[in-house]
């Protein structure tokens, strides 16, 4: 098959556009996260009140779970992606302007709802671009979310050290987000082509659902459980167990997040070369070895190295599962991604609390070491489904 330069250029534009739509939510979410301490101070919240209010985000995601896949399937991922991301950024400003707990909670629920719709729409768009490319590029898209998160953290730190109010910070992020979204909108993949390709795809039914989707969701659940553990407990683990000098308290978190970002940009090449199943097995084993290293040898160097390995392990497990789900062809890509992402999300939701409950009973070292079993589960499930998913990941085409 002969490729024209114009075709390659058009594909490149689509990829950059979808990448931008991954970058923006990372920027927006990190902007919010960076100002949580300031919001807590302004509304005079204690830790318990703040924790309860933050549950509004997963509540919003749960409320939207039953509708996101249907909306994306019926109205198209392009339209829903733009709607979700515009409102996601707009709600950020509403959160910054909230003067009462009620208004903040209501805004956070909307933030969570838009996050869920956006998650389905962005990953559906990514699957469409991946099909056009004919090679594995899903993980690199998720890497752009991580880069957006780093950018949001830096912007947040800059604004936090000025006299400007939170509204000015979030308003600036909103304006920048709208500019990026407007620039990329024209180049997003049109859903008409996807609908034409999916005409022969069977209609969704719980009675005939592909069990592989549940297994992909199970691996995603395990990966996001461990990701939530790194987000919420790595700092606590270093503070209470490793006990390094104060300057190194965040070493585990930084190592894990840095490895996760780098791993997402490297993963596509490994998937193309070795196949998704093998990469998933390695991801599971990295999580297992990393958490065991951090808990069996709770010293600064070994614990940091352990969380570094965990970061590489969790970097690709969820993006790969989404990519496979979108390629199976047993149901529409948007529905398949909804199923896998919904199961996966529960891992992120229940992971940190479960670690906390286990820590109360057996100590934090034991609790985190138990989470290592989920890495083993990823490797085991990947082995079981390897024959089924290998046909979707044997492309050897080169990405731009």
Regions found by a protein language model. Give the residues of each.
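Helix-loop-helix hairpin linking two adjacent transmembrane segments in secondary transporters
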Residues: 103, 140-189
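Structural signature of the two symmetry-related core transmembrane helices
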Residues: 79-93, 278-293
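Helix-breaking motifs and short loop linkers at transmembrane-helix boundaries and internal kinks
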Residues: 44, 76, 97-102, 275, ...
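Helix-to-loop junctions at the C-terminal end of transmembrane segments
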Residues: 64-77, 160, 263-276, 359-360
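Conserved MFS/SLC helix-loop-helix module at the cytosolic interface between two early adjacent transmembrane helices
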Residues: 63-102
């Amino acid at each position: 098959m002969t490729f024209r330069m114009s075709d390659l250029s058009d594909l490149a534009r689509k990829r950059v556009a979808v990448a931008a739509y991954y970058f923006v939510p990372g920027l927006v979410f990190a902007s919010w996260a960076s100002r949580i301490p300031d919001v807590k101070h302004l509304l005079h919240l204690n830790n318990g009140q703040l924790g309860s209010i933050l549950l509004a985000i997963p509540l919003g995601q749960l409320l939207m779970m039953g509708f996101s896949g249907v909306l994306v399937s019926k109205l198209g991922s392009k339209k829903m992606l733009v709607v979700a991301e515009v409102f996601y950024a707009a709600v950020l400003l509403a959160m910054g302007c909230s003067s009462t707990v009620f208004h903040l909670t209501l805004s956070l629920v909307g933030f969570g709802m838009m996050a869920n719709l956006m998650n389905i729409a962005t990953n559906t768009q990514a699957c469409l671009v991946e099909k056009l490319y004919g090679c594995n590029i899903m993980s690199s898209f998720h890497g752009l979310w991580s880069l957006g998160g780093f950018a949001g953290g830096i912007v947040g730190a800059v604004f936090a050290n000025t006299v400007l109010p939170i509204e000015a910070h979030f308003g600036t992020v909103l304006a920048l987000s709208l500019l990026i979204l407007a620039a990329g909108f024209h180049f997003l993949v049109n859903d008409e082509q996807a609908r034409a390709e999916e005409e022969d795809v069977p209609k969704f039914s719980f009675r005939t659902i592909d069990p592989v989707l549940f297994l992909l969701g199970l691996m995603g659940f395990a990966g996001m459980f461990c990701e939530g553990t790194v987000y919420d407990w790595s700092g606590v683990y270093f503070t209470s167990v490793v006990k390094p000098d104060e300057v190194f308290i965040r070493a585990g978190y930084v190592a894990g997040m840095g490895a996760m970002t780098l791993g997402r940009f490297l993963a596509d090449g490994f998937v193309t070369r070795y196949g998704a199943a093998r990469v998933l097995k390695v991801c599971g084993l990295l999580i297992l070895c990393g958490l065991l290293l951090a808990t069996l040898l709770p010293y600064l160097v070994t614990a940091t190295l352990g969380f570094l390995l965990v970061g590489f392990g969790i970097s690709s497990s969820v993006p790969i599962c989404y990519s496979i789900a979108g390629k199976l062809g047993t149901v529409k890509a948007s529905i398949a991604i909804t199923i896998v992402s919904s199961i996966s999300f529960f891992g992120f939701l229940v992971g940190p609390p479960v670690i906390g409950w286990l820590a109360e009973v057996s100590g934090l070292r034991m609790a985190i070491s138990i989470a290592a079993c989920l890495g083993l589960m990823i490797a085991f499930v990947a082995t079981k489904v390897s024959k089924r998913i290998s046909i979707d990941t044997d492309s050897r085409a080169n990405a731009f």
